[in-house]
């Protein structure tokens, strides 16, 4: 009895000599389930259960409507599959025929060689050469069709007038064509049709009158007696600078509104003569500092919805363009004023504001605010560049494609205040500190900067940055974005008289006066005489066809170069271009 009690008690009490669970588990016998059930799995016979013979499976009965619908769906699926198969077959056949047509000489040569056991005889070799020569002749015929015949009685390039090429006369012209009814005329400035839906060109004639003209040369005077010198287009409005330093606001799409702003007055010296006065101008009286002698505008440029101008004291001002109605626009920083950022309300139209952060600066550690003199400004669609008298470059506005020479990022997509970007050019001039920027230009989404090295007046370097999808960068590459300035392949020639369109650029070499162009050429607006869609590096333009010239001599035409005279200029709007004589 005592032994049993001791045994039970010992079982309840914890053992002092504790054994680990791992060791205890290792001593227990181990079994594999495969061994336990292997006999049944490997040797057990499988017997399927059979349905009793007296039990028959009954398919569910369907109504006539269900049977009809299923039949219709089946036929519909078959019709779709048949249509897809026919479409694929047509594409394969058309693609095969097109490939065979384009590569017919190669296919013909391959077939002749195969039929001759892999050998080429003299007859087959001559046949291949004949096919190649036939293709060359066909290509030459196509080029001849694109070259216009200039009548012998027409005036040549030595006589003043206007030549136009690109998208004109409702078709594409690859070579400059002289515009009738404009022979013998010179102009102060020409602005080609500013948009696709408004196919009217504008010009400022010798007297400073604003006229409109179409591609056939039919002219119409819009605003006489204003002594205009230059003009820009923005937000369906025309902005023109006169010799007094005033900017006129001209709603070119609403002639009645123009007429309401015109009044007549008599001349003080010649009372029997009357002159027209135009009253709608950008108001500078309240914002210019007349006490310091700030009285007139000396230069201006415009983007899609903004305008930037320079006064005679080198101060920059900006305004929104268009009509007086509130625009459904969001600022992209193109005004250079932080209070007009993408988060703020769009500024009122045609009201000038000073760009104080561009006109003034303060050195770090100083309390004195200094004045900065701006020498030139240039506007893209939604961005602006500026250079001061020391050669520093400033940029503000839209930077999606790197057109501000700033890194492309979410925080720098819209820059609403002027930022110095001179440092972006330092890697191109290692060890040099006194190089400076001397010129700037912009097209819609690309910027161009001219840098002059120290101690030389002829050693210039040309850079581009921004959108280069159409070859605007001019370095033989196509890029959607480029924030680091890259050199334009200008062959060390000094370039002048720039004209930037939507996605193409014209310029002129200073010594030889050769016209070079690059960028988009989908309408032949570069004037190179070929249907090349894009040109990613500067190319020479063939000279203007002479009256009665033999157009069958293709080598003499395409190997020639257009040289401009001192008074000749080339301008473009991105779709077409023109050459004119400047007053």
From Swiss-Prot:
Listed GO biological process terms: mitochondrial respiratory chain complex III assembly
Membrane topology designation: Single-pass membrane protein
RCC1 repeat copies, ranges: 332-389, 390-452, 459-510, 512-569
GO cellular component: mitochondrial inner membrane; mitochondrion
Segment annotated as transit peptide: 1-25
This protein's name: Protein FMP25, mitochondrial
Transmembrane segments: 83-105
Domain of life: Eukaryota
